[in-house]
């Protein structure tokens, strides 16, 4: 018989469960103390984008930063990977202030191929944030209802806790790193929650099949065997998906980066949590029922 990896030994799974809990606690501390780094779509502000004829040097970037911060102390300057794009992000500015800012900026950026100014007012940003949260909550509720109907109670509870972990772990990483959270981040969260559910279903279905096949065998052994049996399929899916999105992560630019980062991390977290959150909790549950 092929040798199996012991994923769910009592000591191993409990160590990983504790580490996972500690990580989420740390992440939530950052979330409640520092918050998330929301993009302009989720907070009022102005962004001036320039497509440049030639890359900026470090002195020009420093000058732009000083100019922007003379209007707002927390203004940021962001350049594209090829150096020929620049984003100046600042607070919400009235039209006359924007004209003064662009006038000062264009003393540094003399030649450019295109310019775009985006302004989000406070009321619009609040409305966007509320709608994004509502859409996410409704989607999560639908997923949870599906899980509850699809599985028996202990399987469903384990899957729901797993979904919560995937969500909180991803948010924790963005809170700690202060990577930008844009509307595409919400789409990524929903995508990776769907991925995590799918991964759960694959493993849980195999556990149910093996439980019927070996009714007298210890549940932890059955669960561990099921993970080993589905491991190759899971790894192939993870590797091919990550390989497909890696070029977008590297060369996709700042607009796509929050979405791709969330997907990238979520796939890894979702795969990990299927073993050490969903399956581990299920094993603990069954041991308590003995």
Curated annotation (Swiss-Prot):
Gene Ontology biological process terms from the UniProt entry: intracellular protein transmembrane transport; protein targeting; protein transport; protein transport by the Sec complex
Keywords in alphabetical order: Cell inner membrane, Cell membrane, Membrane, Protein transport, Translocation, Transmembrane, Transmembrane helix, Transport
Bilayer topology: Multi-pass membrane protein
GO cellular component: plasma membrane
Gene3D superfamilies linked: Multidrug efflux transporter AcrB transmembrane domain (1.20.1640.10)
Oligomeric and partner information: Forms a complex with SecD. Part of the essential Sec protein translocation apparatus which comprises SecA, SecYEG and auxiliary proteins SecDF. Other proteins may also be involved.
Designated name of the protein: Protein translocase subunit SecF
Source organism (scientific name): Dictyoglomus turgidum (strain DSM 6724 / Z-1310)
Gene: secF
